[in-house]
């Protein structure tokens, strides 16, 4: 097995996701420190873990992940501040006034981003905002209370104030395989930038099936790079399970290998200033 560190093969940050329980596994920690330069919290920085029912916050596991990154000279990436799938009870029961809800959301974002100021190189501020069918932005607790652009404004402005140096992202998936979703995502980005939302980067979750047509990743990254912002190729995995691919397992695995290579080549072809991280 080739043991060459992955981080030595790329001129840009190469990242890995982690859950706090893995930090007690010496084989995992050795592998992570040897091969990667960026660490993303897979779960313990999400609202469903951080926010208690009474509205208080817990940072124990996020702190452990941050300490691991700091002690090994790795960048920390915060994932994720606002996600439609996380609607904590403490937020859902707030009164209906916009001011009350905006204040609570800004307080949460400020607490999270401020706690890791100077260590977190970036944050997924709002995660997966577009409907799967590409028909437009998702309906969520946040958009219902504050409006589609409004909830971006509250969250991004609070994050920017809490850490002016951190790169602030929105992030979504299936952009390579669903042209309508990519188009809707790009329209939202245009709207946010026009409204003055301090969006600093674009996340492209890269959950792929091995039968994805060749060239789709490259076309997607090229389209997103047209905004001139840093690109985070995030959450990369290539499944060989869907679409009857297991009928030809060997062929699916060859295609899987090819897609990983295409993703790396497509990211490497971006202007250097737009290569935020490959994870």
PLM-predicted stretches and their roles:
Residues 3-20, 29, 67-70, 88-114, ...:
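Non-catalytic scaffold segments within catalytic domains of secreted glycoside hydrolases
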Residues 59, 156, 272-274:
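Aromatic-residue hotspot detector
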Residues 34-52, 61-175, 238-243:
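Substrate-binding cleft and catalytic face of glycoside hydrolase catalytic domains
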């Amino acid at each position: 097995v080739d043991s060459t560190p992955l981080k030595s093969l790329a001129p840009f940050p190469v990242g890995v996701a982690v859950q706090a329980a893995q930090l007690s596994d010496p084989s995992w920690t050795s592998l992570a420190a040897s091969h990667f330069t960026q660490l993303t919290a897979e779960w313990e920085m999400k609202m469903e873990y951080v926010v208690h029912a009474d509205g208080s916050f817990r940072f124990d596991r996020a702190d452990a992940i941050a300490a691991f990154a700091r002690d090994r000279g790795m960048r920390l990436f915060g994932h994720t501040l606002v996600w439609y799938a996380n609607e904590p009870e403490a937020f859902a029961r707030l009164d209906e006034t916009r001011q009350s809800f905006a204040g609570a959301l800004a307080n949460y974002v400020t607490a999270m981003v401020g706690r890791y100021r100077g260590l977190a190189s970036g944050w997924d501020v709002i995660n997966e905002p577009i409907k799967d069918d590409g028909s437009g932005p998702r309906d969520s607790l946040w958009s219902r209370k504050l409006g589609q652009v409004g909830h971006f404004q509250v969250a991004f402005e609070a994050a920017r104030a809490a850490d002016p140096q951190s790169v602030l992202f929105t992030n979504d998936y299936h952009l390579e395989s669903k042209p309508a979703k990519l188009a809707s995502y790009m329209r939202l980005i245009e709207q946010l930038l026009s409204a003055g939302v301090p969006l600093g980067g674009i996340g492209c979750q890269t959950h792929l099936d091995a039968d994805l047509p060749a060239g789709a990743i490259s076309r997607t990254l090229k389209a997103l790079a047209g905004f001139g912002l840093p690109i985070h190729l995030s959450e990369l995995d290539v499944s060989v399970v869907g679409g009857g691919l297991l009928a030809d397992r060997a062929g699916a695995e060859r295609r899987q290998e090819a897609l990983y290579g295409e993703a790396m080549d497509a990211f490497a072809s971006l202007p250097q200033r737009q290569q935020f991280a490959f994870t």
